[in-house]
């Protein structure tokens, strides 16, 4: 019940949860604001989300609680089973002890052969039994068993020790007898064998007898186990029945207390009813004569005697109520009984009889109530006699106690959780406010950053424009014949496109500014679009940088080519000078040597040079012819294409003129556009041709330069070698001349001698010169061969260069294709950029559509983040609680493992004990008797309960009837009292009238007195009418609206309090709302 109550408490939402939540106000400055409490909530989706989350949490917590309850139930069942096992173990242990006692009594282990044993101590032990029948292991101090269990363990250990000792004695006796038999000489081996066989037979019979007993004991043990299970089930049923009986007794006690209270209330009401008021003697003092006084005194004395007698019989408490109960009879019965008029004395006698009979009935009822009270007291005493230890030691009481503890612990835990959740809610509200303020500041800061970024982009666009203008100026300063003009024009077009794109971006930025001022775009989408725009701008900037780098590389290449051409020209002039010098040197050599061979060689060299020059001229002419042929072919192709296009256009014009005469203006416009396109195509083709020519010239120049450089290097080498040889010859001639001059200057006497010597020397020199000439001729031949080889090498190199030229042409064509592909890519990039611009426009439109809901989305995002944070905190708290619970469960599992280990040890001990069980009948009989006694006692209690319940029902009925009868009698007694008073007054009037008639003549003055007495009587009657008919004390204040009978306030509300709610005069039912006050 406590858990259900707790769940109900959980399900109840907090009282001021919705009223305390701040609602939203639609504004542009702030995303959230407070709304009056009476206004409707704006963020209903968030409330639904929170409700769903709370439902999920509650369901998860319920599942966790159910799992924990199941685990607790499992633990309780295990503990219950453990306790039942212990109880069964105790029972079996008792049975085992009793069986062992019986076995010891039946079998005499101690024989009369003790005297035959030797006096020396026998050290041997019966190892077989000691190994087979081991004493149970002593329990550790950790195991906290009851004292009864420990005593039982000690008993079993002592019995097993006795059995082992007896068997050891028997073994020692058998050994001793065997030794005695061996020691005797008169006894033969056959006799010994016979004795041993007899002993073996006896032992086998004893073993069989013991085995039979053991089998019977096992059968009895099985039966006892079955009976114990059956008895345990019956005991549980009886416990349940006892519980039900206790509950019924408690209910009966509650009902009896209620009835006692009702009886006490009735007694109080009867005490409240006043006694019969006798008229005071002062009222009758004015009446003449003493007869009236005597009569009144007699009547009063009779009434007082009756009242006193009734008071003695009923006791002091009920005297007034019963005295008033004698005054309740109808007016018709008072005046007429069986059609006869009765006197006043007869009426009084009948009333006394009725009151006596009713008093007797009341006495009987009181006696019956006293008997019932005694019986109830006896039942209470019987219940109290039940010992508290028995109730406390019972399993259900302990289980209930444990459950109560668990439930109390869980209640404490849940209370702590509730307090924590309340604190978390308070912190969450504070956190929401702080986060709102932070978000407002963040949005303002973000707007400022966006405006700064826009200004930075404008500055960057202005800088790009300046750089573009500088580039345009640099490009215009260059020569238009440079082959990079096409790239420059393309770059200009791209730059113009970029300018247009930048202008469009500026327009879009201005639109975005306007849109941002109007609306608020969501944060994430704005960041995404910013990133996209930045990426596009960066990609375009990268493309611009690449184009600028290409332009710079092309300009550098052109500059390098120009410098190379200048260098080549300088080298050619230097080579011409070097050739002239070589020629002059060669001429000098030829003049000095005067050899024909040298002249022929020079002519050959000249011829070779001329041939080389002619070959170069031929190659150049061939290249020029090929270029001219290509140009002519291209021009022819262009002319053919133009002619074809013109023919097609003429055909189209003719068809259009025939079919559509009305659309001549449009056709003219189309023709103009087509002509412009043709011109642009022609321009493009010319530009491509110029580019091709320039590339071919560059390649040829490079190749020619390379070949010329190689040739010049070889020629320089040859010239250097020739110069060296000529220098040697010149030195020789100069030496000869010097010698001649020296000889001329010498003495004439020695001229002849010197001439002879000179002739001899000259001969020698001539011979050496001839040898040198031969060597020179050989060297010339070698040089000729080398020149031939060099020519061949140059021819091979020329062929290789032709091959490289063809390859370069192929590469040039591939580069053209690549250029075309790049142009196509640039076009595609432009189209993609236009598509991106269109997408940007669409996205701006989407942003303008979505900016209306941005405030709501931001608020929902904030709240969702807060709920996520709260949920994370709650999850962390739940995880901590789960960890704690898991630790508790682990500790409980460890305890259960210890308990299971204990139970396993006990089960092992049980398995050992059950092997040596012999009898368990006495305990069974005891239990049976106990169960029978319990059955008989329970049957008696049931019969008593049934009897008491019947008595209670009858007493309730009787009490209700008696109460109803007493109330009626009280009303009748009150009415009778009123009638009595009226009759007394009538008697007084009659007596006074008689006296007046007798004394009319004598006392005329008494008329005045009679008139005064009659007026007093009228006043009394009026007072009686104004007084309440129930109590005759208080005035009538309240009216019952249904029957219009008037009573005093106290009497009516006493009727309402007793839940009777019927009119005392007409017995008509009424409600508390039918009672109204009267004002005189």
From Swiss-Prot:
Compositionally biased, Low complexity: which spans?
Answer: 25-34, 284-312, 319-330, 994-1014
According to UniProt, this protein's pathway is:
Protein modification; protein ubiquitination
Q: What EC number(s) would the UniProt record show?
A: 2.3.2.27
**Chain segments carrying region Disordered:** 1-37, 274-335, 721-742, 991-1016
Molecular function as annotated in GO = ubiquitin protein ligase activity; zinc ion binding
Task: Name the UniProt key words of this record, in alphabetical order.
Answer: Chromatin regulator, Coiled coil, Metal-binding, Nucleus, Transferase, Ubl conjugation pathway, Zinc, Zinc-finger
Reactions accelerated catalytically: S-ubiquitinyl-[E2 ubiquitin-conjugating enzyme]-L-cysteine + [acceptor protein]-L-lysine = [E2 ubiquitin-conjugating enzyme]-L-cysteine + N(6)-ubiquitinyl-[acceptor protein]-L-lysine
> Which stretches are zinc fingers (RING-type)?
1028-1067
Q: Which GO terms describe its biological process?
A: chromatin organization; protein ubiquitination
Function according to Swiss-Prot or TrEMBL:
E3 ubiquitin-protein ligase that mediates monoubiquitination of histone H2B.
**Which PANTHER family is this protein grouped with?**
E3 UBIQUITIN-PROTEIN LIGASE BRE1 (PTHR23163:SF0), RING FINGER PROTEIN-RELATED (PTHR23163)
Protein name, as recorded:
Probable E3 ubiquitin-protein ligase bre1
């Amino acid at each position: 019940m406590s858990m259900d109550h707790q769940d109900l408490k959980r399900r109840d939402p907090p009282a001021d949860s919705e009223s305390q939540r701040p609602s939203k106000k639609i504004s542009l400055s702030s995303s959230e604001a407070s709304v009056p409490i009476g206004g409707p909530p704006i963020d209903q989706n968030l409330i639904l989300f929170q409700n769903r989350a709370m439902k999920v949490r509650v369901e998860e917590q319920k599942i966790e609680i159910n799992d924990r309850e199941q685990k607790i139930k499992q633990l309780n069942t295990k503990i219950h089973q453990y306790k039942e096992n212990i109880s069964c173990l105790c029972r079996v242990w008792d049975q085992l002890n009793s069986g062992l006692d019986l076995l010891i009594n039946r079998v005499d282990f101690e024989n009369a052969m003790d005297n035959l044993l030797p006096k020396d101590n026998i050290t041997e032990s019966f190892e077989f039994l000691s190994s087979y029948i081991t004493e149970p292991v002593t329990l550790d101090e950790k195991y906290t068993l009851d004292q009864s269990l420990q005593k039982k363990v000690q008993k079993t250990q002592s019995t097993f020790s006795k059995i082992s000792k007896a068997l050891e004695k028997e073994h020692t006796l058998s050994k001793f007898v065997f030794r005695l038999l061996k020691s005797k000489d008169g006894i033969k081996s056959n006799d010994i064998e016979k004795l041993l066989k007899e002993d073996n037979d006896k032992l086998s019979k004893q073993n069989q007898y013991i085995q039979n007993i053991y089998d019977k004991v096992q059968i009895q043990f099985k039966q006892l186990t079955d009976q114990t299970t059956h008895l345990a089930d019956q005991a549980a049923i009886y416990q349940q029945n006892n519980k039900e009986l206790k509950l019924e007794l408690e209910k009966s006690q509650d009902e009896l207390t209620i009835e006692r209270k009702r009886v006490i209330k009735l007694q109080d009401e009867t005490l409240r009813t006043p006694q019969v008021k006798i008229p005071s003697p002062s009222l009758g003092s004015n009446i003449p004569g003493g007869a009236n006084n005597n009569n009144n005194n007699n009547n009063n004395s009779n009434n007082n005697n009756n009242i006193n007698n009734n008071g003695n019989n009923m006791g002091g408490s009920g005297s007034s109520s019963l005295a008033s109960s004698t005054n309740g009879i109808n007016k018709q019965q008072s005046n007429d009984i069986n059609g006869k008029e009765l006197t006043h004395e007869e009426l009084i006698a009948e009333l006394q009889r009725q009151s006596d009979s009713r008093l007797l009935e009341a006495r009987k009822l009181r006696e019956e109530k006293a008997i019932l009270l005694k019986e109830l007291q006896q039942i209470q005493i019987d219940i109290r006699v039940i010992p508290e230890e028995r109730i406390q030691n019972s399993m259900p009481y302990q289980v209930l106690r444990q459950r109560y503890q668990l439930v109390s612990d869980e209640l404490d835990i849940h209370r702590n959780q509730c307090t924590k959740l309340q604190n978390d809610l308070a912190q969450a509200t504070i956190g929401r406010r702080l986060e709102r303020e932070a978000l407002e500041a963040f949005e303002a800061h973000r707007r400022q950053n966006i405006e700064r970024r826009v200004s930075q982009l404008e500055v960057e666009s202005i800088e790009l424009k300046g750089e573009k203008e500088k580039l345009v100026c640099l490009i215009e300063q260059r020569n238009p014949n440079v082959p990079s003009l096409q790239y420059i024009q393309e770059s200009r077009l791209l730059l113009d496109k970029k300018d247009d794109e930048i202008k469009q971006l500026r327009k879009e930025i201005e639109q975005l500014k306007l849109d941002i001022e109007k609306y608020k775009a969501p944060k994430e989408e704005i960041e995404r679009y910013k990133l996209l725009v930045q990426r596009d701008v960066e990609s375009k900037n990268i493309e611009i940088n690449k184009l600028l780098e290409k332009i710079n590389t092309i300009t550098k290449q052109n500059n390098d080519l120009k410098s190379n051409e200048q260098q080549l020209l300088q080298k050619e002039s230097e080579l011409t000078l070097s050739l002239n010098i070589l020629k002059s040197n060669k001429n000098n050599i030829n003049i000095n040597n005067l050899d024909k061979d040298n002249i022929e060689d020079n002519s050959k060299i000249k011829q070779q040079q001329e041939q080389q020059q002619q070959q170069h001229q031929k190659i150049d002419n061939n290249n020029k012819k090929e270029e001219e042929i290509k140009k002519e072919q291209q021009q022819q192709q262009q002319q053919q294409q133009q002619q074809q296009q013109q023919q097609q256009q003429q055909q189209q014009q003719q068809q259009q003129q025939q079919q559509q005469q009305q659309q001549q203006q449009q056709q003219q416009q189309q023709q103009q556009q087509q002509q412009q396109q043709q011109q642009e195509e022609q321009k493009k083709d010319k530009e491509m041709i110029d580019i091709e020519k320039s590339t071919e010239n560059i390649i040829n120049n490079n190749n020619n330069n390379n070949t010329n450089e190689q040739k010049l290097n070889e020629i320089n080498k040859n010239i250097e070698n020739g110069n060296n040889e000529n220098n040697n010859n010149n030195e020789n001639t100069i030496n000869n001349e010097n010698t001649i001059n020296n000889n001329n200057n010498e003495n004439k006497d020695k001229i002849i001698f010197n001439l002879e010597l000179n002739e001899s020397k000259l001969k020698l020199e001539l011979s050496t010169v001839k040898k040198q000439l031969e060597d020179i001729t050989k060297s010339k031949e070698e040089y000729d061969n080398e020149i031939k080889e060099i020519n061949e090498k140059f021819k091979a190199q020329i062929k290789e260069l032709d091959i490289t030229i063809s390859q370069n042409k192929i590469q040039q064509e591939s580069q053209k294709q690549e250029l075309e592909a790049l142009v196509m890519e640039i076009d595609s990039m432009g189209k993609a950029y236009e598509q991106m611009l269109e997408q940007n426009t669409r996205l701006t439109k989407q942003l303008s559509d979505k900016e209306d809901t941005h405030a709501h989305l931001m608020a929902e995002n904030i709240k969702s983040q807060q709920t996520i944070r709260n949920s994370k905190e709650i999850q962390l708290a739940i995880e901590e609680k789960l960890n704690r619970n898991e630790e508790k469960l682990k500790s409980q599992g460890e305890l259960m493992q210890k308990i299971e280990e204990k139970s396993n040890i006990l089960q092992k001990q049980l398995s050992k004990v059950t092997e040596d069980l012999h009898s368990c009948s006495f305990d069974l009989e005891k239990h049976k008797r106990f169960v029978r006694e319990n059955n008989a006692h329970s049957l008696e209690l049931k019969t008593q309960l049934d009897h008491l319940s019947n008595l209670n029902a009858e007493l309730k009925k009787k009490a209700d009837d008696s109460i109803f009868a007493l109330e009626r009698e009280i009303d009748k007694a009150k009415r009778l009292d009123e009638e009595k008073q009226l009759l007394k007054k009538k008697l007084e009037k009659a007596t006074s009238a008689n006296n007046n008639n007798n004394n009319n003549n004598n006392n005329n003055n008494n008329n005045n007195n009679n008139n005064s007495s009659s007026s007093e009587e009228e006043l009394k009657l009026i007072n009686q009418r104004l007084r309440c008919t129930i109590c005759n004390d208080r005035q009538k204040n309240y009216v019952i609206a249904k029957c219009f009978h008037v009573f005093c306030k106290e009497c009516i509300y006493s009727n309402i309090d007793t839940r009777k709610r019927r009119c005392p005069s007409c017995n008509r039912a009424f409600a508390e709302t039918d009672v109204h006050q009267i004002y005189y």
